[in-house]
UniProtKB/Swiss-Prot annotation:
6'-bromotryptophan modifications at: W36, W37, W43
Domain of life, per lineage: Eukaryota
Role summary: Mu-conotoxins block voltage-gated sodium channels. This toxin reversibly blocks voltage-gated sodium channel in cephalopods, with no alteration in the voltage dependence of sodium conductance or on the kinetics of inactivation.
Keyword terms, alphabetized: Bromination, Disulfide bond, Hydroxylation, Ion channel impairing toxin, Neurotoxin, Secreted, Toxin
Disulfide bridge positions per record: C3-C16, C11-C28, C18-C33, C27-C38
Protein name per Swiss-Prot or TrEMBL: Mu-conotoxin-like Cal 12.1.3b
Compartments it resides in: Secreted
Native source species: Californiconus californicus
GO MF, any single term: ion channel regulator activity
Gene Ontology CC annotations of this record: extracellular region
Length: 44
């Protein structure tokens, strides 16, 4: 998922946080950032 400011900067469906410098790209969680998708996300 891409990050969505309408859900407090989290990625839709998975609760990861947006990287501030790339609010429409990277998603972050405790494992770090990846491009477009959050680690462990299978369906989004």
């Amino acid at each position: 998922d891409v990050c969505d400011s309408l859900v407090d900067g989290r990625c839709i469906h998975n609760g990861c946080f947006c990287e501030e410098s790339k609010p429409n790209g990277n998603c972050c969680d405790s494992g770090g950032c990846v491009w477009w998708w959050c680690p462990g996300t299978k369906w989004d």
